[in-house]
Swiss-Prot record:
Induction: By NaCl and mannitol.
Record protein name field: Receptor like protein 28
Organism for this UniProt entry: Arabidopsis thaliana (Mouse-ear cress)
Native organism taxonomy: Eukaryota, Viridiplantae, Streptophyta, Embryophyta, Tracheophyta
Glycosylation sites: 60, 72, 93, 106, 111, 147, 170, 173, 253, 348, 363, 396, 407, 420, 431, 476, 632, 648, 680
Family statement drawn from the similarity comment of this UniProt entry: Belongs to the RLP family.
Length: 778
């Protein structure tokens, strides 16, 4: 019987194990039981044991690509795929290595904590496809890999593997070899490209040296060698790989300019990336030196100073990246006539305008066009009818945003920040996903129609002359994640109603004319569960904040994990070609400085309430925000002690509580925050000692503070207290002591009624002041 395969979802497989008399039930599942006859019982038990070796809470149980397959005739496991599922240590004695008949194994994107690469993989000598990419494997690839004689695909990319080139030369069936982004070094075997079936080779991001031998009979079609220095003679032999279709040689760090003549013999080449290398100016002027088959050409950061005329002849060109060069002058008119050109980046150059009439743009085939960070002046041209994403920020465009964009039905992303546009925001942007108009001279009110299409994810109109109120129609933006209207002239109360937006992560309202309380009625928590960045600085907000103000900030309460360096980057393949990547920008006060943050981390959490009229205690629930990176409450009227719970904000890097009326001592717990690089508590009423390592300006203006870095010594009446002021215990999940509240309820109620009667009848000033003091500092 032929080796047909029966796909078995691993959850269903575990269900059979759990009802088997030979295994104990650890889980219960509601999934339907599939026909498991093909898998023998000992194979089921081995798989169950393997899965139980790891934490599997990350497993996506609805992902039908994950699972286990058994051969119909033998009943043994021949295919196993657990992608982005497992956490733990892959030990040499793992039951994984019992599956000697495996032909396909995919364990990519897991979180293995092994310190070395298990040599037992070499025992799986029937495996044909092995994917261990995007894990945490370290050390050298064991020599036992040379036993995998049936291997056709080996994926080891994005690990931390070291040592010399793995011993794979005798694996003559290999067609796909991927070592991208590791730490391999040493010499590449000269015969590597002589392997008879090798069609894909990715050595990108390593430290290899040596020369390579090439045969014209090589079947290699895809070759990636870029990012790290590759010492040795490799460029000339590459010209003999006549079957190449994709070639990546970016950032080789070679000392001489590349001559495009090297690639003239590659008649099948469709993709060429030479970014980060110097290109011979002569070869950029002649069309004799470049394959006419090219569809994608990347020449980013190549030191090019004039637009290459060779592009005229590339009639099949679909994508070109000429960003981060030194090209000046005007963008040539013929460029828009290339019949297939759909995506182009000319960003970060010195272009100052367009050659000839810009009307030719309208009928071009362009879908994605980046021309930000140039010196282009004048009115914005009419965009191509096919445009989907357009970025032209950081130029000198002026005049009004043309209403012709209303007829661009495919337009999803419009980015025009840092220009000199005037007039009003067009009413017709309702179908866009990203609107970025920051730092222009736009005026009028925010259009009510912005959310008519319910697709808006980012709206950034900060630093303009916008007036009026925040339109309630923003409630229709159910997909909105990023809203920035800072530094305008908006006059309104705090938009509590925005809490209805389920995906809102960033809310920037700073430097407007907003006023009133920011605490919900009845002192309930502020309900923005997904909010990460909340900036309302320099307005006229007033009132107090309840101790439970931040209780419902669920996203910011999550602990930062190992994936905490991901940016808030949007990738939308709906554009139909290479993903459009957009990075949100915020202006923030961080470590005492005002700065622009162009990339907002997914795990990044910041609060800025500075420059308002807020009073009372700082909410103790602030300690629940474990992801909080920056907190600025300066220039308000907060009183009482700095909450001890701040010590629970373990990711805190910047803390500014200056120019308030805070009293007591600086909590010792702040000294344990390993990331806290900046603290400013100046101009308060604090006493005791400071945190060593900060500048003295961070503590000045507190008459009761003494010791380094201040000049005042701690002696006599200025000696610090022996212990912190006693406060109630502050747990992460409970910010009020409800037992104490319940115990004193009866007595407190009677006393409260009596005091209320006195106040209502006579309102003596002395009693009102006492009640006010207890209200804020109890």
């Amino acid at each position: 019987m032929s080796g047909s395969h029966l796909r078995l979802r691993f959850l269903s497989l575990l269900l059979l194990c759990c009802v088997s008399s030979s295994t104990s039930s650890l889980f219960t599942f509601s999934y339907p039981v599939l026909d498991l006859v093909a898998c023998r019982s000992h194979q089921i038990q081995a798989f169950t044991q393997f899965k139980n070796e790891f934490d599997t809470h990350r497993c996506n149980h609805s992902d039908h690509s994950n699972g286990v397959w058994c051969d119909n005739s033998t009943g043994v496991v021949t295919k196993l795929q657990l992608n982005a599922c497992l956490s733990g240590t892959l030990n040499p004695n793992s039951s994984l290595f019992w599956f000697h008949q495996l032909r396909f194994l995919n364990l990519s994107h897991n979180n293995f904590t092994s310190t070395s690469f298990p040599s037992e993989f070499g025992n799986l000598n029937k495996v044909e496809v092995l994917d261990l990419s995007f894990n945490s494997f370290t050390g050298q690839v064991p020599s036992s890999f040379s036993n995998l004689s049936q291997l056709t695909e080996l994926h080891l990319s994005n690990n931390q593997l070291t040592g010399g080139f793995p011993q794979v030369q005798n694996l003559t069936n290999l067609s796909h070899l991927d070592f991208e982004n590791n730490k391999f070094s040493g010499t590449v075997p000269s015969s590597l490209l002589m392997m008879p079936f090798l069609s894909y080779l990715n050595l990108y991001g390593n430290h290899f040296t040596g020369s390579i031998e090439v045969s014209t009979s090589s079947k290699l079609e895809i070759l990636y060698l870029g990012l790290k220095p590759f010492e040795g003679q490799i460029l000339e032999p590459i010209s003999k790989l006549i079957n190449l279709k994709r070639l990546e040689l970016s950032f080789l760090n070679i000392s001489y300019p590349l001559d495009l003549n090297l690639f003239s013999s590659l008649k099948s080449l469709t993709y060429l990336d030479l970014s980060g290398n110097s290109i011979s100016p002569r070869s950029l002027r002649s069309d004799l030196y470049i394959p006419l088959t090219l569809e994608k050409l990347l020449l980013e950061q190549c030191g090019i100073i004039e637009f290459p005329n060779i592009l005229k002849t590339l009639q099949k060109l679909e994508y070109i990246d000429m960003s981060n060069n030194r090209i000046n002058g005007k963008i040539p008119e013929w460029l828009w006539r290339l019949p297939r050109l759909r995506s182009m980046s000319l960003a970060n150059n010195s272009f100052n305008g367009f050659e000839g009439s810009t009307d030719v743009l309208v009928n071009s085939s362009m879908e994605i066009l980046f021309m930000h960070s140039n010196n282009i002046q004048g009115a914005l041209p009419n965009l191509p009818l096919s445009i989907k994403a357009f970025s032209a920020g950081y130029n000198n465009f002026s005049g009004e945003i043309p209403l012709s964009i209303c007829n661009r039905s495919s337009l999803a992303a419009l980015s025009l920040p840092y220009n000199n546009f005037t007039g009003k925001i067009p009413q017709c942007l309702s179908n866009l996903t990203f609107v970025h108009l920051r730092k222009n001279n736009l005026e009028g009110s925010i259009p009510d129609t912005l959310c008519a299409g319910d697709s808006l994810q980012t709206l950034d109109i900060g630093f303009n002359l916008i007036s009026g109120t925040l339109p309630r129609s923003l409630l229709n933006c159910s997909s909105l994640e990023f809203l920035s209207v800072d530094n305008n002239r908006i006059k309104d109360t705090f938009p509590f109603w925005l809490k209805a937006l389920p995906n809102l992560q960033v809310l920037i309202l700073s430097s407007n004319k907003l006023y009133g309380p920011i605490a919900p009625p009845h002192q309930s928590p502020l309900a923005f569960p997904e909010l990460r960045i909340f900036e309302i600085a320099d307005n006229m907000f007033t009132g107090t904040l309840s101790p439970r103000y931040f209780v419902n900030w669920k996203t910011s309460s999550l602990t930062v994990n190992e994936d905490g360096d991901l940016y808030m980057v949007y990738k939308n393949n709906a554009f139909g070609i290479d993903s459009y990547v957009y990075r949100d920008t915020i202006d923030m006060k961080y470590k005492g400085l005002s700065m622009e943050q162009q990339m907002v981390l997914n795990s990044y959490s910041a609060i800025d309430f500075s420059g308002n009229r807020l009073e009372g205690q700082i909410p103790k629930s602030i300690g629940l925000l474990k992801e909080l990176i920056a907190l600025n409450l300066s220039n308000n009227a907060f009183t009482c002690h700095i909450p001890l719970s701040l010590a629970n904000a373990t990711e805190l890097e910047s803390l500014d509580l200056s120019r308030n009326q805070l009293s007591g001592t600086i909590p010792n717990g702040l000294k344990t925050l390993s990331f806290l690089a900046y603290i400013n508590v100046s101009h308060n009423k604090l006493k005791g000692t400071q945190i060593i390592g900060q500048h003295k300006s961070s503590f000045e203006g507190n008459a009761g503070l003494c010791g380094l870095p201040l000049e005042e010594t701690c002696s006599g009446k200025n000696a610090p207290p022996t212990q912190q002021p006693k406060e109630e215990d502050e747990e992460q999940e409970q910010v009020l002591n409800w037992k104490a509240v319940a115990t004193g309820y009866g007595t407190g109620l009677l006393l409260g009624l009596a005091i209320a009667q006195v106040i209502a009848s006579y309102k003596p000033d002395w009693l009102v002041k006492i009640i006010g003091l207890f209200r804020f500092c109890f």
